[in-house]
Amino acid sequence: MSLVITNPLSNIPKAPKSHNLGYAQIWADQLNAKIDHTCTKNIQNADIVYINHGVNFTGSINLFGGIDRDIYDRINTLFMCKKIVSLEWDIKIWTDNFRKRIGNSSTYHKVTEQWCDKLEALLKNIPILKQEDLNMKGITVGDSHTLAFSDKTDKIYRRDGATLHGALKTGLKNLFRDKPIEGNITFCFGSIDIRHHLLRHNNVDLKAMIKEYIKQAKECTNDPKFAAPVPVEYEKRKLPKTGYYKGTPFFGSQSERKRITDDFISILTDESKGNIVMPPRFWYDMDPEKYALNFMEKGSSVHIAPPNYRRNDFGSNPLTI
């Protein structure tokens, strides 16, 4: 069976260090599908076309360049496909968004009410496939770093911006999307607490927090694994405003946050009896600018680059440092 993943509204990047590519590649691996990066007419030959909305999609469409002829042509290609499945999101929102743009200077003139009616008829029957619907051997649950710390055989229950503090307050057992907690479970929390919160408060008992983390995790599964927090990059690295908290990209100096990171890893390792998923130790001790250059996503980002994900053995052949 021929399976393909694509996005008619925006190209799926080809750059190896792209967060968006990493997200699409994980879906491709899980589904045993290929990626059509530019939504070519070749997708008509696939038995199933999966629509990837992008790692940062939250339910609303951002078409900064308008609905140009390329997007119009790509969507017309969808009309010729055998079967279409939308990944994670209800695709029917496209129609209302397009109707609002009819007649705009940035909208292709063939995007009309009649064309939108045809599109609506197509989209209303497209099913949604979510991570929790997959048949996989394990689950990685946590913040946006779950992409980097998930195993090849895992579903990913990702909650961007999630903190360990917030997860414990909610209850780890309540983070599994009302599905059975089965298989190998990896929890991925703590990086955002270190980046933004722990140094703001002088009364945080880190050991007590981690003990509660492990306690709640063991209430979910007998043998949980815990992702280490990510290394702390150099302070001058530019970050997107979406990663800011109270107007800043982090709180505390690089050296202070590294100290907290080292303490977190040490306590987590001891209290979990070594059940920790961690990149190579030298990442944490090397020059933070070289770490960012070699192992993080290209440009402004807080994430590990896809070639260095856990599923890729954390880059078993790392770049020259």
Where do the language-model regions lie?
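Charged phosphate-binding loop/patch that engages nucleotide di/tri-phosphates or the phosphate backbone
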Residues: 118-132, 305-320
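Alpha-helical cap/lid subdomain in secreted, periplasmic
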Residues: 43-113, 117, 128-134, 176-306
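Serine-esterase "nucleophile elbow" of acetyl-processing enzymes
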Residues: 2-38, 101-182
